[in-house]
Amino acid sequence: MAKALEDMSLEELWQLFPIFLEEHNKDWAAWYVEESRRIQSFLPANQLYKMHHIGSTSIEGIWAKPIIDILLEIPRSEDMGSIKRKLLEYGYLPMSESEGRMSFNKGYTLQGFAERVFHLHLRYYGDHDELYFRDYLKDHSAVAKDYEQLKLILWKKYEYNRDAYTEAKTDFIRRYTQKAKKLYKRRYDDKIE
């Protein structure tokens, strides 16, 4: 009998779900829209602040892991636990939790990746550095291509170690996120409670 995904070690999960990249797929934007509408259909509007397509699949023209990253920002007055219960009820699986952050996935199966795979990043409003990085890459195609080249190199080196792959990109992401914050100033800093 096969182990359940939640009973697998990180090493077993990395074997089943290796890092792989593919050329940009124009359908990724539509998949994001469909999934964001689905999420809006089961989460009450007062529990949502904003949803965003983030990650490399949101950047046209660069290779990416074919996983749609969604940033779901909620008002600080909302209880993450109640949103977590709803997400689990509607097919999302927990990935990680830390102070004020939860991550979920959908599309991971015992046979490997499903056709459509999603990572949902649940955060309180204001924890959204990924938006600055995304916008900087969209506005600076040479930097986006540099990021793509870095990922292509790291892909084969860390194909079966997602944590190392992510860590190896961190300095690049931090550097350009800081540049973006200086350039775009307070682009995403609305005033909400």
Features from the language model and the residues they span:
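Short amphipathic alpha-helical segments
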Residues: 17-19, 66-70, 116-118, 133
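Active-site nucleotide-donor binding segment shared across nucleotidyl transfer reactions
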Residues: 39-78
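Short glycine-aromatic motifs
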Residues: 46, 91-92
